[in-house]
Amino acid sequence: MDYQEILDGIGVPLLLSPVPLEGGGYYLPDAFEYGEEGALIADGTLCGEGLELVVLHECGHKITGCTLSKLSAPQLHIVNEAKANRFMISRKAEDYLVEIDYMANYFTPERFLQRFKLSVELFYDMAEQEMKKIAKKNKHLLVY
């Protein structure tokens, strides 16, 4: 499933900024002038996989919902960023498994993170967790 299908499914329009955006993009839940679900704005100077990673991350803010416990604004921001990153990694790991023709030996966090130019330091644990879930879900398709 590509990011446009996800956006269509959640009813959030994608707006591309003509200038670079710090952080690559933002989900604006209160941008009601674009629809009931708000809007997603992404850095229009990005292309290809860079844009896809930003859009998937921002979709994660909408899809994973909000935290019910009382947190300070900085704590809540950290939680929301982690949820959005997990969503992005999960979707790209599913794509990666298809890309490597379900070859189990190549479905490693190191290769995945290198392929998408993501920080091993920041994303290794999360990628490992998500990839284990995906491998388990697709175990009947894996080639050893």
Task: List the predicted regions and their residue ranges.
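Active-site hotspot residues in diverse enzymes, especially metal/ion-binding acidic/histidine motifs
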Residues: M1-Y144
